[in-house]
């Protein structure tokens, strides 16, 4: 039973170094605490579509790993501060001679005003590791954001379960926490820092995925196109049965975002999709 039940944890740990370009980040310094909240108008329908590519530059065993990502998000302003955001994503990752495909989606229902946003989310992800078995991961949780003139602080916590199809006795608990900051140098130049923790637990096995990511975003003045690039550090640890295995991965990534319904990078966040995907980066 231990060998069978550990399969879902092993499967997660063996395919989780695919690069992702979600925009989250941790706390900023106390010098920003005296800024006043920014006023904003109703947003209507605002969204974006983005594509990115990432490659591991340092990984356990020097594994040759890279991934490309296609993602989209749209926000619907229902009036009176209530909003609905929908996310969809696809990732294709390569590890040596193995190709994996993952699909994910999320639905966010929340309230937003000039000072803060708060709500709930549900999400699902499906991983096809190319070995005839698919892994499904479902999660729900709460999220919140706080707006000032030149920065946004946001975070989320969630709980869900991961399972392997055709193996009814394999279910891992999935715990997630994230904290992020978006810092605006101008309305079209933003720097993001994000941190997240995912824990998968089943029986006596725990799989922890800790990540920190730095991202620079620049939106062109003449066109609704944003260029972004950054660095992501990931630490993975598989523990249990009186032993543990861990490894670190460094990833460089870059991409393009095509926006609609907004005129600046800052307006896109304040009136459009404010939440990042909380998925496990397979």
Question: What role is predicted for each listed range?
Answer:
Residues 22-30, 202, 226, 239, ...:
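Flexible, glycine-rich linker and terminal segments associated
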Residues 135-202, 209-213:
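Detector for outer-membrane/organellar transmembrane beta-barrel domains
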Residues 79-86, 113-120, 150-155, 187-193, ...:
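Repeated loop/turn-to-beta-strand initiation elements of outer-membrane beta-barrel proteins
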Residues 70-76, 107-111, 142-146, 179-183, ...:
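Residues on the lipid-exposed face of transmembrane beta-strands in outer-membrane beta-barrel proteins
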Residues 43-45, 64-70, 99-105, 114, ...:
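Residues that define the transmembrane beta-barrel architecture of outer-membrane proteins
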Residues 49-55, 86-90, 107, 120-124, ...:
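Transmembrane beta-barrel strands of outer-membrane/channel proteins
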Residues 21-94, 282:
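Short glycine/proline- and aromatic-enriched beta-strand/turn motifs that initiate or cap beta-hairpins
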């Amino acid at each position: 039973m231990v060998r069978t039940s550990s399969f879902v944890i092993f499967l997660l740990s063996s395919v989780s170094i695919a690069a992702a370009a979600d925009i989250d980040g941790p706390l900023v310094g106390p010098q920003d605490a005296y800024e006043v909240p920014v006023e904003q108008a109703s947003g209507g329908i605002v969204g974006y579509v983005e594509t990115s590519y990432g490659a591991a530059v340092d990984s356990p065993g020097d594994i040759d790993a890279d991934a490309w990502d296609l993602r989209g998000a749209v926000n619907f302003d229902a009036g009176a501060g209530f909003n609905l955001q929908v996310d969809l994503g696809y990732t294709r990752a390569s590890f040596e001679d193995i190709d994996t495909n993952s699909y994910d989606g999320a639905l966010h229902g929340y309230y937003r005003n000039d000072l803060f946003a708060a709500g709930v989310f549900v999400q699902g992800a499906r991983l096809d590791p190319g070995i005839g078995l698919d892994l499904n991961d479902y999660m729900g949780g709460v999220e919140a954001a706080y707006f000032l003139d030149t920065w946004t602080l946001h975070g989320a916590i969630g709980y869900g379960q991961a399972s392997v199809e055709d193996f009814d006795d394999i279910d891992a608990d999935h715990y997630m926490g994230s904290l992020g900051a978006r810092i605006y140098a101008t309305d079209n130049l933003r720097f993001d820092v994000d941190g997240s923790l995912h824990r998968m637990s089943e029986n006596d096995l725990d799989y922890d995925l800790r990540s920190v990511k730095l991202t620079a975003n620049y939106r062109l003045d003449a066109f609704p196109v944003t260029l972004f690039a950054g660095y992501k550090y990931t630490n993975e640890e598989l523990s249990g049965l009186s032993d543990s295995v861990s490894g670190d991965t460094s990833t460089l990534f870059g991409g393009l975002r095509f926006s609609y319904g907004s005129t600046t990078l800052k307006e896109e966040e304040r009136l459009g999709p404010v939440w990042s995907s909380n998925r496990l980066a397979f």
